[in-house]
Amino acid sequence: MNAVLKSAIAALLVLLSVQAEAGALDQFKSFVSSTHAAKGEFIQRQVKVTNGETKLSNQASGTFLFARPGKFIWLYQKPYDQLLQADGEKLYMYDKDLNQVTTKLLGSALSSSPAAILFGSNDLETNFSLKEAGAKDGMDWLQATPKDKDSTFTLISIGMQNGLPREMDLRDTFGKTTIILLQNVEKNPALKADQFKFVIPAGADVFNPQ
């Protein structure tokens, strides 16, 4: 799984209106406990530091839909078509240009990943250490540190605004940071019974690495 896809299994959100003075941690816990599904749009960028200068690069964008626990559709629309979809048991990664599908069991891999914050169960503090991180850029921030030392990510920063997650900054074990902006988030939309069922595209090559 390439770096872009790893970062992508990282983000989606939910909402609940809370008091304006509530801290990021209270806002986020209320958001998580009150929302069983959500949809919206995302913009994803990577942070690069060259000669001491910080730049944002590799912009990608698309839409997302999720339902707890472990079901989601994360669709890249620009600059290319790629799909990450999970049905609660398996994760499907579809590259439209290659007409190629890679499948993996969700298993325990979800528990300490950024995806667990958005798509997993409500028991966040089992897998993450959470703490307030102050205010910046008009948002209240919290930090989530995975308790699993084998996690791909070392720190996840979440920006909350008016009871909604608006930004996730993901720092991986190589020191690289991916920023995901969340827009037009809608809480608890109506879902079809087979909303997250993945259908293998005609003629697609299917890989099942273990």
Label every PLM stretch briefly:
Residues 1-9:
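Bacterial N-terminal signal peptides that target proteins for export
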Residues 18-22:
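Sec/Tat signal peptide C-region and signal peptidase I cleavage site
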Residues 23, 27, 33-88:
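N-terminal mature ectodomain segment of secretory-pathway/periplasmic proteins
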Residues 44-46, 68-70, 76-80, 87-90, ...:
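A mature extracytoplasmic/lumenal domain signature
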Residues 49, 80-82, 100, 150-153:
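Short beta-strands and strand-coil junctions in structured, solvent-facing domains, enriched
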Residues 93-119:
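Acidic/charged, solvent-exposed loop-and-adjacent secondary-structure segments enriched in E/D, K/R, S/T
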Residues 102, 126-131, 135-210:
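Gly/Pro-enriched, hydrophobic low-complexity segments
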Residues 115-120, 127-131:
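Anionic-ligand binding region
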